[in-house]
Amino acid sequence: MLQQIKSYLSKGNRAQWCFFVLFALTIFLQCCLFHWLAFHSILISSLWKNPLAFWALYLPKISISLFIASFVFLFKRKGWTIVVSLLINIWIIAELIYFRANRIFLDAQSFTLISNMDGFWSSVPMYMYSSDLILLLPNLLLISGIIFLAAEKRNTLSAIAIMGVALVTNIGGCLATRYVYDTIYKVPQDKNYFNPFSDEAVDALFGFTSLEYPINTSVVHAFIYATKKLIQLPFESTSYMMTDEDKQLLEPFINVYTSNIKPDRNLILIIVESLETWAVHPKIMPNLWKFIHEHNVIWAQKVESQTKGGTSSDGQLIFNTGLLPIQHGAVCKRYPHNTFPSLSDLYENAALVQPGDLSVWNQKYMSDSYHIDTNYLSPQSLDHVTFTILDSIYRLHPYCMAITMATHSPFLACSKMTKLDLPDNMPENMSNYLRCMHYSDSCWGVFLKKVNTDLVLQNTTICFMGDHIIFDPNMRNTFATYCAENQLDYDVNSAHTAIITYSPNIDKKYIVSETTYQMDAYPTILHLIGCEDYYWKGFGVNLLDSVARNNRPISEQEAFVLSDKIIRANWFESVVK
């Protein structure tokens, strides 16, 4: 049977065409598997429910597969196709890891952050799943084809013809995408939306963030576009000129600049690495739980994480400045010398307790930009040292910010530094995470108890805030299944972080159960320390104000867009002059 097939394919260009189809199918399957591994869906049902959306999703993947596969007609030997397919797999794995960790995809700016991974590469395996092995199937299919098919011929005309078909298919995909998203993205007629690699098409047609682009084109498009942008980075201007319309939109959030505003109480801001709301539990975090229930606090339980590519550094930006992160890259790497509004501005001196060293997230320069006067270093992951330092300095500095690190993924450094009793069959990542949270909470215990007796702390606004969420939906589903089967009361499906704030002028306990945002922390703090007249109000709302929580002056997406422009324009430099 095999000999008959080989004999049939040996005539004319049949083997060549068969291998072309096989290679195109390999790339197409890789694109589809990427979508499935990222979103657990390939939207087959949309073929009959919403055909236009189906073709908008699949035509770009078909076109790029045809285009790359057409090169088999230009080269006799086919071994290069294995290299290409393996490179696509490597890129897919990189995209999936980054997406699972940050909920955005890689872009050119992401590569500028590689140096920040020093000491944190151990976190990567946590985001690699056994299901990712399915990506090898298209490679095995291709290798089998190379072994079976003797297709060592050239056919330039066929290559040109296929490239033409790929171009037409690409145009069809772009047109379909345009009309599907027309109600969301208003694309002017003169936009070059036929070219999915043009900046104007990416911005106008495929959305403002890097999340949309690989979805609406393909993972291969994303690699080509990221490579193009990476080459262009040294020659691109990173600045932006604020328009009159931008400035008009900012008016509700700006007061007249003055340096005379003074806070009426001290401030301690504790940024907790990877704090998710479901971990704030009497068994896991007994000290924080007791503190919440013994004092009048604001406890925002469903806080949307708004960090982007800067992850932890973005959390610090949001809490300190009331701004949101830029859409591409990290503020700490791209704009470390900008002028920023900051809570530190309001105090005579401010201090930071930083685990590790000041090279992480470019902290040395960001401390200067946030007007932090003194940096104290503690050993990475050892939160008990962090709080020992904080306990020794809070009387010296009216504003102290402390960053915890014990709960950084992959949750191994401190998981054995606690005697928390957990079931042996609990998923490993869940168990290690909860143990690290328990250890971190134990480090806060003595400090939190002092609020009952220490007059300085009693007159201090103390905020605990999670810098970002950590688990992707697939891992969260695994945890939820385990909890349901074992009747555990952890609400792991709540993909939110928390804001817990104590202040002597909070007159009762506020449990905020509706969805809020990290950007709400900044205006809430301004209110609690008596500095609501500070020149920058922030895009969020005061969490104590239930009316404001339900009548926001700006949507989250609008705030992201405007904040991106403000930072790229270094607009605050002109405000404080």
Predicted features, each with a name:
Residues 2-220:
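Transmembrane and membrane-interface helices of multi-pass
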Residues 51-55, 330-332, 433-434, 486-487, ...:
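Active-site rim elements
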Residues 74, 358, 504-577:
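Membrane-interface soluble catalytic domains
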Residues 89, 116, 346, 520, ...:
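Generic recognition of well-ordered alpha-helical segments
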Residues 166-427, 435-437, 528-531, 535-544:
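Active-site-proximal alpha/beta segments of enzymes that process anionic O-linked groups
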Residues 314, 458, 465-505:
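Histidine-centered active-site microenvironments of extracellular/periplasmic hydrolases
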Residues 317, 403-410, 463-476, 545-548:
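Acidic helix/loop microenvironments that form the catalytic cleft of cell-wall polysaccharide enzymes
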Residues 417, 439-443, 447:
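Active-site neighborhood of glycoside hydrolase catalytic domains
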